[in-house]
Amino acid sequence: SFSLNVAFEELAQGISVYLSIPLFLLVIVFGILTDGIGVASTKADEKAILSMASRKVAGARESLWFVRNAPRVSSVFNDVIGDVCATLSGALAVAMIYKVRSLFPTVDLVWLTSLGVGIVSALGIGGKALFKPFALKHAEEMVLVLGKASYLMRRVFRRK
């Protein structure tokens, strides 16, 4: 995590503020979505997915794997990918803070850093808190979307 943070912060230093803001928001949204996927995989009803698989719904078989392996899926999506997204968003925020400070040298760095940390926390934690009820309510649909994505990737990258 430390080396990833250092590497990404170095990369982020070379990106303009106009590009780093959308990239920052993309990383935050990706973290929120992966957290929702982890929650949905633990909540999804195996019977509903099994019913879709018996009707040959594309991606349902793959979705079944995600539901049956929910503890591992949740661990990867919530913990691993979520932590990586948090680290990346923090690194991007620090890079943006220093860029803003270079544009406005009279602004207090402590104030600017506190504001940056607050924004990162509010967007990340708040976004996850707001998205979790949706993920719980639409667990089967979310897992099916994940299964369809897995199905498509498998078809595109299968060996011939």
Where in this protein do the model-derived segments appear?
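Membrane-embedded alpha-helical segments of inner-membrane proteins
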Residues: 1-160
